[in-house]
Amino acid sequence: MYDELSVSFENPATDAMGYQHIQGKLYCGRDWLELQFKEKDRAFRKSDTNVVRLEYGEVEAAEYISKWFQPKLLILQTRSPEKLDEFPGADVGRVELQVMRESTSHAKRVAALIDYRQSEAFLEESEERVERSRESE
């Protein structure tokens, strides 16, 4: 189901109580991305793992940012913001994943792979549009 590429991430809590601490993985499949994440459990509430599946055509941008003495970030921006509503800290279809140290080499490749798969999806969509226009003539 998955290619060999996955990136582990851990976003620290953004609120004072420490509730929005997230851990998860981004898997790159043949036809889609799968973002699996879980909020840190609270004293009286256990959280389930959330799974968000995104087609490559739905991804607007993927960027890997690596600066010295700062967390390594993999930034995803989607065309459908409602898919990322459950992700704490998501900003109108944009999420920043703080890549764990052991996944930094994969994160660089993931951004390039997403760009490549996006190109394939857009090419396929364009070919379908051309075929439809030829059939209607």
Question: What is each of the regions a protein language model found here?
Answer:
Residues F37-E39, E60:
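Glycine/serine-rich loop-strand microenvironments at binding/catalytic pocket rims
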